[in-house]
Structure formats: C-alpha cells, structure tokens
A protein has these predicted regions:
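Hydrophobic alpha-helical transmembrane segments
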Residues: 60-74, 78, 130-134
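Membrane-interface interhelical loops and short amphipathic "cap" helices
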Residues: 34-53, 110-119, 176-185
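Interfacial segments of alpha-helical transmembrane regions
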Residues: 8-15, 82-95, 147-159
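Terminal transmembrane helical module of multi-pass membrane proteins
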Residues: 140-220
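Small-polar-interrupted transmembrane alpha-helices in polytopic inner-membrane proteins
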Residues: 90-104, 159-169
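Interfacial helix-start motif at the membrane-water boundary
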Residues: 46-68
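Alpha-helical transmembrane segments of multi-pass membrane proteins
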Residues: 18-39
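Membrane-proximal helix-loop-helix units in multi-pass membrane proteins
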Residues: 99-145
C-alpha cells in the first residue's frame, strides 16, 4: 500500500472524526444541553439526548461519520500491515464501530415516556463503544513511538471512564443513583473528547506513514 493510499484512508478518518466534533460542539453551542426535557444543562444532559431535538439529524450525522471514518481507519491500518485482520486491535476497533452504529440505530430512553428496549440497547452500545476504543488504540499503537499521542489520549479516556464506572460501583452498594453521583454530561463529553481525539491521532499517524519507521525500530 503506497503513501498516497495511506493518506487517503487517514484523511477520511480525520474528516469523519472532525464532522462528529463539529456536530456535537454546534449542538452544545445552540441548545446548551437542553433536550425534550426542560431544564437540562450540559452538566447533566448526555449527548444522545439531542436525538429528541430538532438537531437530531446532526447528532446522527456526527455519530455515523465517526463510525465510517473509524472503519476506514482500520481498513487503512490493515492494508498497511500495521494491524492483522484478526487481532485484538482489529476486533476491538470493530466493536467500537458496532457500538457507534448501535448508538445511532437505537435511541436512548425517552424519560418523558419511560424506559424502552431501544434505550437499553443504546446504553449497552454506548458502553461497548466507550470501552472498546481505548483498548483498541492501546492494542494497535502502544508499541509505536510515533503513535504516542493516540496512546496518551486513550489513557485520558480511561481516566474519564474510571469516573463513570466508579459512580456505577458506588450506586451498587448505596441507595444513590449512579447518574446523579457525577455530572454525567460533563463526564460523557470528557470520554468522547479523548476518544475522538485518539481516532484523529491514529488518522494523522496513518497519513504520515510513520508506522514504517516504528516497525523497523521494533525489529530485533
């Protein structure tokens, strides 16, 4: 696979991630976290709540653009020989994409009506995506010196995830609701920021083609 092909796959990945960033920031700037539930703010409102607003199309566009960019990023890394088709890295990256598609396909619970099967699937898909991406980045890039920015961003997302799972753990041994223990909207945006950043960092790594040098450095 030549350098031009590397760059093409990498740029598509970066573009998909950038579209998701623009979509979320635009929704946050215009709606400020408000959804179909009055009084919601960025502190507590999740990004997925935008699906019930007039900006629902922008939310879906951002998620699907990120999914498309991520699968093409994986394809580029596989074709470049950096990732084996059947490896922890490729499987975890595929799970990240599956999670994103699930987030888009199954809207979260509409609490104006009540819990739903779609909302439960959405929650599982969200957790699948959140956990899979940093694990995929570490599996793919941790041994490559030139990919360190992606690795650092993956560790950043893990730090935010620890806050989320810590709240869930506390709720299991107390009467507190996990989503009220933490500012869920801020925590979720922290996770998303670092994970989308990691996708962009991997895309830039692919564009530069620096994995070739990294592979040589690893050779005995």
């Amino acid at each position: 696979m030549d350098r031009v092909s590397h760059a093409l796959f990498g740029w598509i990945a970066v573009l998909g991630a950038a579209i998701s960033v623009v979509a979320i920031l635009t929704l946050d700037a215009i709606l400020g976290g408000e959804s179909h539930r009055p009084g919601r703010t960025l502190r507590m409102a999740t990004i997925s709540e935008y699906v019930y607003t007039a900006g629902g199309w922008a939310f879906l566009t951002g998620v699907l653009a990120l999914a498309v960019g991520s699968i093409l990023l994986l394809a580029g890394l596989i074709r470049a020989g950096v990732v084996a088709p059947l490896s922890f890295g490729s499987i975890l990256m595929s799970l990240w994409v599956i999670g994103l598609v699930g987030v888009a396909a199954f809207p979260k619970h509409n609490w104006e009506i009540g819990p739903s099967t779609s909302g439960s699937i959405h929650r599982v898909a969200t957790l699948l995506a959140f956990v899979s991406l940093p694990a995929a980045v570490l599996a793919i890039a941790r041994r490559h010196r030139q990919a360190r920015p992606a690795v650092w961003l993956a560790y950043g997302s893990i730090a935010w995830l620890s806050v989320l799972f810590g709240a869930i753990a506390v709720s299991m041994v107390t009467d507190l609701r996990w989503h009220r223990i933490i500012p869920l909207g801020i925590v979720e945006r922290g996770i998303v920021a670092f994970e989308v950043g990691a996708v962009i960092a991997l895309g830039i790594w692919l564009i530069r083609g620096e994995f070739v040098t990294a592979k040589r450095l690893e050779s005995p």
